Swiss-Prot record:
The lineage of its organism: Bacteria, Pseudomonadati, Spirochaetota, Spirochaetia, Spirochaetales. It comes from the Bacteria. Residues 148-173 are annotated as: Disordered. It comes from Treponema pallidum (strain Nichols). It is a lipid-anchor. Residues 151-160 have a biased composition (Gly residues). This is Uncharacterized lipoprotein TP_0462/TP_0463. GO terms for cellular component: plasma membrane. Belongs to the TP013X lipoprotein family. Keywords: Cell membrane, Lipoprotein, Membrane, Palmitate, Signal.
Length: 392
């Protein structure tokens, strides 16, 4: 059995990266938007914003000034010789996991300054043997399989105490995401079952059933709704943060079951992300060839959070409010639309970065691309100011 815990010092979840073989030819688009030489090569498995800098991990830690629309990523002199597999941020700190070893801390000096501080240089307490970290507001730490039938695996590489709370789950079950009162894994949705004390105790939610197995991803709108991705559908749910026992019920005020899930129509779906693009909110579903979007119903009515089939849109249906506007669809189709997108990240714009729409900021969107020839594998960004996709 694995144990997934949430000790007070940490904050977690994770995105699963799927390796796929894909090919494409970019020559036809080079004349329209010259492609940059990538400053990060390889598979990016995490991206966070910390102290007005961006940090990515692709085996090692990379950083970039988030306040500038241009600029290259530079490698951070942090944990040389070790392979960082996942990261989260909190305040001015980046927490980096070396799978099977534990979690280390890197303190960012902030935008306009180079370097940082490794604090401490040893594995953080209660993280020995950690496999993965992830998430934001209520992240989780995933620990390895138990070493014996008598150990809980909580917070100590198989030798911790069950008083840490968390989830006891199978060795083939991985955390995909978490938020206030819930955790989503590849097999189930778990909801908080104990509203007292500081421990994080969760139980499998019997009110939620995925259409297909395994569950592939989850994302949150930051306002109480979270969305679960499986092979055919996206499910909209909400949960009481205090763990009132109602489970992850339908997030739509009307309670209509047909409003709580929709077929995403994405071939070989791999990831899901929530994007607030100006005044419009979307779910982006990455798959084996680019992504599709689901426009969310927003407002104060009974349809808030509602998922509708008519709002599932491919490139031919994108509008000016889309992440990739309709007049940039050809550039999308000539670049990332040809390849697998295995992860999607959004970064709120700061001074000098991002675009605007009537005074409302639009975020930059980063995607992880997979190419069978490896020539275009890596991190790409939609620059909301320039309105174009390009390599990072």
């Amino acid at each position: 059995m694995r144990r997934i815990v949430c000790p007070p010092v940490l904050f977690l979840s994770a995105s699963l990266l799927t390796g796929c073989d894909f090919s494409g030819i970019f020559a036809s688009i080079q004349s329209e938007v010259p492609l940059k030489i990538p400053s990060i090569r390889g598979v990016v498995t995490g991206l966070v914003k910390c102290n007005n800098k961006l940090y990515a991990c692709a085996g090692q830690l990379w950083e970039k000034d988030a306040s500038k629309s241009e600029g290259k990523w530079t490698a951070v002199n942090f944990l040389p010789g070790k392979k960082i597999t996942s990261i989260v941020s909190k305040g001015a700190c980046v927490y980096a996991c070396v799978s099977g070893e534990g979690v280390y801390t890197y303190t960012s000096n902030g935008a306009g300054r180079t370097g940082g501080t490794t604090t401490p240089s040893t594995v953080l307490g209660k993280t020995n043997g950690a496999i993965r970290i992830g998430g934001s507001d209520n992240p989780f730490l995933q620990m390895p399989c138990e070493l014996s039938s008598g150990s809980s695996g909580g917070g100590g590489g198989g030798s911790g105490s069950s008083s840490d709370g968390g989830i006891k789950n199978g060795s083939d079950e991985n955390v995909l995401g978490s938020g206030t009162g819930y955790v989503v894994t590849t097999k189930a949705v778990y909801t908080k079952s104990n509203s007292s004390g500081t421990s994080c105790t969760y139980t499998k939610d019997g009110t939620f059933t995925a259409t297909t197995s395994p569950i592939l991803g989850c994302t949150s709108d930051g306002k109480g709704c979270f969305y679960v991705l499986d092979g055919t559908d996206v499910h909209c749910r909400t949960v009481q943060a205090s763990g009132g026992g109602n489970g992850a019920h339908c997030a739509v005020a009307s309670g209509s079951a047909t409003s709580c899930k929709v077929a995403h129509t994405v071939t070989n779906p791999l990831c899901i992300a929530h994007v607030k693009n100006g005044q419009t909110e979307f779910l982006l579903i990455g798959g084996s060839q680019g992504y599709k979007e689901i426009k969310l119903e927003t407002g104060s009515g009974s349809g808030t959070g509602c998922l509708k089939a008519e709002n599932v849109r491919g490139p031919e249906q994108w509008g000016e409010d889309s992440v990739t506007p309709k007049d940039r669809v050809s550039q999308y189709e000539g670049t990332i639309g040809r390849f697998a997108i295995s992860d999607i990240y959004t970064v709120e714009s700061t001074s000098g970065a991002g675009g605007t729409n009537g005074g409302t900021n639009k975020p930059d969107v980063y995607v992880v691309v997979g190419d069978s020839q490896d020539g275009y594998t890596g991190l790409w960004r939609f620059d909301a100011q320039k309105k174009e996709w390009n390599r990072e």
